Amino acid sequence: MAAKIRREDEVIVLTGKDKGKRGKVTQVLVTEGKVLVEGINLVKKHQKPVPALGQAGGIISKEAPMDVSNVALFNSAAGKADRVGFRIEDGKKVRFFKSTGELVK
């Protein structure tokens, strides 16, 4: 099945502590059904120093994966979250916004 949300897409968070925030998808974890969104769902990780690799220890913030059902593609023309469909144009399968019918970049 084709992915409705792909890397580099701009998405809006639908649920959770970051509801309403927008960000760019940095990674899609297809087998787990999760996405990593830049600057969203940040968690603190306590990291031990690794002198052999020259890494300092401390507390770092990093993005945690969130379920793909908790984000929606952001339609900048409409200014809101939108659903995505697929259609065939010129022999290629393309994504389009269901509310406006225009193609996703």
Curated annotation (Swiss-Prot):
Any one of the GO BP annotations: translation
GO cellular component: ribonucleoprotein complex; ribosome
Record key words, sorted: Ribonucleoprotein, Ribosomal protein, RNA-binding, rRNA-binding
Keyword Ribosomal protein found: yes
Pfam family, one: ribosomal_L24
Superkingdom of source: Bacteria
A GO molecular-function annotation: rRNA binding
The family this protein is said to belong to: Belongs to the universal ribosomal protein uL24 family.
PANTHER family: MITOCHONDRIAL RIBOSOMAL PROTEIN L24
Summary of subunit composition and partner proteins: Part of the 50S ribosomal subunit.
Role noted for this protein: One of two assembly initiator proteins, it binds directly to the 5'-end of the 23S rRNA, where it nucleates assembly of the 50S subunit.
Protein name as catalogued: Large ribosomal subunit protein uL24
Gene: rplX
